[in-house]
């Protein structure tokens, strides 16, 4: 039955490119038949860059989102690719939380006019991620460097 969840599930093919143009999108979408060639060109362009920095990763992400290759999960896949590329190029990775979702989406929409919003929200996310890593390092080093007398005292309190 058209318009039902079951109809949607039958149309969505995880891991395969979409074959239709998604409805309710606020931007023009490429045809399903153009997805493979568009992704190939995007990847080739990205991989031939002399240097990959945060801005190039974000531009790749925005263009990936414009291609919108799948029926569902494009944002999750795109953000996972960004995380992987940050690690690959020794850039502090980041996780975009729900609190910043609207700014992230606005930044994608405005990318070719003004890159500030997306770069800013990502820099905030990188800073938070780096702080979390540093906090974990401090906690681990505090556990590692505790004097033996202190550790013994903790054991005695537990008994």
Where do the language-model regions lie?
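FIC/Doc superfamily catalytic core
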Residues: 1-159
